[in-house]
């Protein structure tokens, strides 16, 4: 849940309901971004489309507002005291259903400040390394573990590193599988958001001059692209260097079958097998 788009009370009630319906199967991931690609969409997500976009606030203001909302969400979930500045009487609000707790809460981030927030609140932390140097993920998770403060007895650091990965029969095949997503990234950053296209169209696409400039600036060092053994080795090395407890992969493809096949190739390379059907 991108918390700036929702009220903490709304999120608390939604996820308590989900936790009631599917006990043990729900996690609540919380992020600071709105997910919007432009100011007008961002305003529509938060204040409604009838309002002009609010003037951009500084990063510290955004961070402080998010931290307050996150603390309020945890308080509505019965996990914390309400933060200073919360509405009078907030602690008396009856959050429904009131006989089930919030599911486990994870903070998603990509910066040192997010790592510090997760550590200060004693939350599990999922750090995305998208479009970034993998060394930043290693440093971010080191900072998280170093600063971790348990909120309750038994709490301990739990770190996830989030990566983009495309696994083909070989590197050339993997690069082709990644081409629709990378094209969409370039077009979005150039101001022309577009859906994923089939591989053959992505490979044949001719970039405009502005798009070429954007593509040249993209830092794709954190992407895992290659054959099964190559990606398995890269993934294992990063997991060991970062000390991650879990790895989460994002594999956006035009064809769903390509995504499934990519996961299957990597699973076989690292020795994972599908669980037996119930």
Task: Label each PLM-derived region with a short phrase.
Residues 1-3, 31-35, 110, 130-132, ...:
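Active-site beta-loop-alpha junctions enriched in small/polar residues
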Residues 1-9, 99-109, 219-228:
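Active-site mouth loops of central-metabolism enzymes
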Residues 3-81, 133:
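Flexible, glycine-rich active-site loops centered on histidine and acidic residues
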Residues 18, 118, 174, 238, ...:
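Conserved, mostly hydrophobic/aromatic
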Residues 25-29, 104-106, 124-126, 158-162, ...:
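Structural preference for beta-strand elements that scaffold enzyme active sites
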Residues 113-134:
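A conserved active-site cap/scaffold subdomain adjacent to cofactor or substrate pockets
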Residues 233, 239-278:
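Generic C-terminus detector
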